[in-house]
UniProtKB/Swiss-Prot annotation:
PANTHER family per record: TRANSLATION INITIATION FACTOR IF-3, TRANSLATION INITIATION FACTOR IF-3, MITOCHONDRIAL
Subunit structure of this chain's protein: Monomer.
Pfam family, one: IF3_C
Sorted UniProt keywords: Cytoplasm, Initiation factor, Protein biosynthesis
One biological process term in Gene Ontology: ribosome disassembly
GO cellular component: cytosol; membrane
GO MF terms held by the record: ribosome binding; translation initiation factor activity
SUPFAM superfamilies found in the cross-reference section: Translation initiation factor IF3, C-terminal domain, Translation initiation factor IF3, N-terminal domain
Subcellular location: Cytoplasm
UniProt name for this protein: Translation initiation factor IF-3
InterPro entries in alphabetical order: T_IF-3_C_sf, T_IF-3_N_sf, Translation_initiation_fac_3, Translation_initiation_fac_3_C, Translation_initiation_fac_3_N
Zinc-finger is among the record's keywords: no
Annotated organism of origin: Methylobacterium sp. (strain 4-46)
Length: 173
């Protein structure tokens, strides 16, 4: 049964099948090509670890550094990258065909805020009862939303009827 693979670069005696390495010291200076065991001895004398940085080059590039600190810094960088990464959410705005002007303006301000936050917006227009006979009013309303947001958003999904509601999805530019 093969030994389990560790994630991250190989260090010290985990580096196998290598006769010579290109050594970079702790200050970043190139120490040249030397035998693997000589490089390992230099690392032990300096109280540091020999870490394989570029395993695919010939000869492999190894660097003298504190492996524990190196792993810690790598984990911190990954955590910071995850923190900075924003997941795009789909926010929903619900409208009715007979919406008043003020209510419409309030909804449009919310749409604008969602785009500033980088979220997509799903505009849902719900028809009730006999409003289904006047789908053209609903389509005009969604076209108006599209026209007012064309500067800051692009249409990801054109208005389409699904059951008793018409749906359009907008994404920020």
């Amino acid at each position: 049964m093969p030994a389990p693979q560790k994630d991250g670069p190989r260090a010290n005696r985990d580096i196998r099948g290598v006769r010579e390495v290109q050594l970079i010291d702790e200050t970043g200076q190139n120490r040249g090509v030397m035998g693997f065991f000589d490089a390992l001895q230099v690392a032990e004398e300096a109280g540091l670890d020999l870490v394989e940085i570029a395993p695919n080059s010939t000869p492999p590039v190894c660097k003298l550094l504190d492996y524990g600190r190196y792993r810690f810094n790598e984990q911190k960088k990954q955590a910071e990258a995850r923190k900075r990464q924003k997941t795009v959410e789909v926010k929903e705005i619900k409208l009715r065909p007979g919406i008043d002007k003020h209510d419409y303006d309030v909804k449009m301000k919310a749409v604008q805020r969602f785009f500033e936050e980088g979220d997509k917006v799903k505009v849902t227009l719900r028809f009730r009862g006999r409003e289904m006979a006047h789908q053209d009013l609903g389509l005009r309303l969604l076209e108006r939303v599209k026209a007012e947001t064309q500067e800051i958003a692009k249409v990801e999904s054109e208005p389409q009827l699904e059951g008793r509601q018409m749906i359009m999805i907008l994404a920020p530019r």
